[in-house]
Amino acid sequence: GDECEIVTMRDLKYDASTKDVDDELKPHIMDIFKSDGIVFATPIWWGGHSSHIQSMFQRLDPIYSWGKDNKFQPFYNKVFGTLVSGGGDGFQHIHGNCYNFATNLGFTVPPSCNIESKAQGMDEIVKDEQTLEQVKNCAINMSTWARVLKEGNPTKDARHGTVDVSSVGGETDYAFSDDVQEEAAGVGIVTKQNATKDV
């Protein structure tokens, strides 16, 4: 079977930053590189997602910038889903924001991987039959699409860069760079930083 890890961001001490910060959130961000997929779960707060989800957008931004600079998307071949609790109007907007962000980072969103639950809080969500059915759909589809992506490995043939940032410059010395370079070289992708390596 598949394994998953639940990370509760409110229990972590972390900085809300667009920089590569070494704090309690950093190891979990690094784990995304080794995972087959990720789910963002958030309640609706005044029609929007939580501040913790916004912090994830910000903290993953350096990876997005690195991907543009190096013409390599490290999150290709990985799947993405969302869970929004609290019900009512607004969940479509939250899914949309999350999916827009995820696809720009290279994630694939399988069908039926958007969960809406009127229940709030883990204790209530696990008792809600409708929510549990959506969770089953999401889990099966994410697992299936992750397997298909891993076996097909579209990363090697896909286009990795849509923006020419060569004239923009910017910081690219991130702590995750070496790991991503190794992955890129493994699929035969030549990035700016690994261009001198034998790929």
Give short role names for the model-derived ranges.
Residues 1-70, 125-199:
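N-terminal beta1-alpha1-beta2 submodule of the flavodoxin-like/Rossmannoid cofactor-binding fold
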Residues 13-15, 89, 121:
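Flexible, glycine-rich phosphate/dinucleotide-binding loops
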Residues 70-115, 130-133:
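Short, glycine-/small-residue-rich phosphate/pyrophosphate-handling segment
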Residues 89-93, 117-119, 162-167:
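Amphipathic, soluble alpha/beta structural segments
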Residues 115-125:
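A short small-residue
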